Amino acid sequence: MSAFLPPIPTPSPDQVRKYLARWREGDNEKIDAALQIVFHAMPRNDDLGEVGVKVAALNGLYSTNIFGVVQVARHIIALDIDAILADNIVVPDLVERIANVDFGGKRRRNYSFATKYCNFHRPDVYPIYDSLVVGVLSALLKQGEKFDTFTPGEHWGTDYAIWHRSISRFRTHYGLDEYSMRDLDKYLWMVGKERKGMFAGPVPASGGSPRVV
């Protein structure tokens, strides 16, 4: 975020409601609804065709840079993740195991994709990690907001447990318990999209095209 951008308003229920209303007005809501239909219709992760469709749909609509859909689908099936996803407690290691895929002897870490894949199965448990949301949270911390504190070596992008902790503390700190993890993701993403658009003209109510991270 640029030093020339105005401060982000302190998060509050009113702020969240405002940005969620903008989200619902635009195309992102329709894309989310379509993906939810896909994931709800195929909740299990033990069939190559079904997992492949979910990987391809998520990758195509959210530009998650998955280059080997079938290979990633086989990788997910081999992890046997359904029992873990059924649990109501976040398992950070699940995100890491989905994220780390071997391609021709080289390991690729599809971190943002893995958080989205878990989120579309369990939006109440697994918050999405992406660059716009990171930018907003980082800007708030630089503004002096105190929703979380960190010890040396803790990083959102390398440890999903830290990311989940920060989102959870963010919700509690600002009195946003009425909103789901997914609602907070939409709010933060819309704030980030708006700030990014301040250098490229007004951001439409739709929030623009599907997120690219």
Predicted regions and their residues:
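Short hydrophobic alpha-helical segments that form membrane-spanning helices or hydrophobic packing faces
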Residues: 113-119
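An N-terminal alpha-helical hairpin/helix-loop-helix interaction module that forms a charged
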Residues: 1-106, 123-213
